[in-house]
């Protein structure tokens, strides 16, 4: 590997705009590096939705399966539907699909005001808590063995 002396490089460009091109470029560079150093696996989206007769989403779960893992990104239930086990059914459907795809584990993170008890009640185990996030809250990280 050729080392570059960074002392002769010009100033860093610092942004606060979240430019999609900048994010894409760094993501692609990191992905290229990662693929050279780990086994190949494919990220496959998974979505489970409850919609009304017009197609309006009332509840849903989105995520991806990646190798051995179901990674849950978002789970939302309309307030008028909460308390009817719809979240449980969405989660169970996503986990069943992940098992069909060969996943052994699930991962999710949630804020303290969202659903920590929900995930614990479904067999998820807390593995990490990010304190004072973003200022006074907590962000909880959970995993679960699917098999």
Model-inferred region functions:
Residues 1-18:
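Conserved N-terminal entry element of GNAT/NAT acetyltransferase domains
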Residues 26, 119-120, 124:
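Conserved active-site tyrosine of GNAT-family acetyltransferases
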Residues 41, 52-53, 61-75:
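A conserved beta-strand-loop-helix scaffold within acyl/acetyltransferase catalytic domains
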Residues 45-49, 60, 74, 139-141:
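Short hydrophobic/aromatic beta-strand element in the GNAT-like acyltransferase core
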Residues 65-73, 82, 134-139:
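A conserved beta-turn-beta hairpin within the catalytic core of GNAT-like acetyltransferases
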Residues 83-96, 121:
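Conserved acetyl-CoA-binding loop-helix of GNAT-fold acetyltransferases
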Residues 98-111:
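Conserved GNAT acetyl-CoA-binding A-motif
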Residues 107-109, 125-142:
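Conserved catalytic-core motifs of GNAT/GCN5-like acyltransferases
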């Amino acid at each position: 590997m050729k080392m570059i002396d960074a002392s002769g490089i010009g100033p860093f460009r610092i942004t606060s705009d979240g430019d999609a091109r900048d994010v894409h470029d760094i993501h692609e560079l990191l992905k290229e590096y990662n693929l050279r150093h780990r086994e190949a696996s494919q990220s496959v989206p998974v979505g489970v939705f409850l919609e009304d007769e017009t197609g309006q989403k009332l509840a849903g779960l989105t995520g991806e399966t990646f190798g051995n893992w179901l990674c849950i990104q978002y789970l939302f239930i309309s307030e008028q539907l909460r308390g009817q086990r719809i979240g449980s059914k969405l989660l169970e459907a996503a986990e069943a699909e992940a098992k069909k795809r060969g996943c052994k584990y699930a991962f999710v993170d949630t804020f303290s005001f969202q659903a920590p008890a929900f995930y614990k009640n479904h067999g998820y185990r807390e593995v990490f808590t990010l304190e004072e996030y973003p200022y006074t809250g907590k962000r909880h990280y959970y995993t679960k063995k699917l098999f």
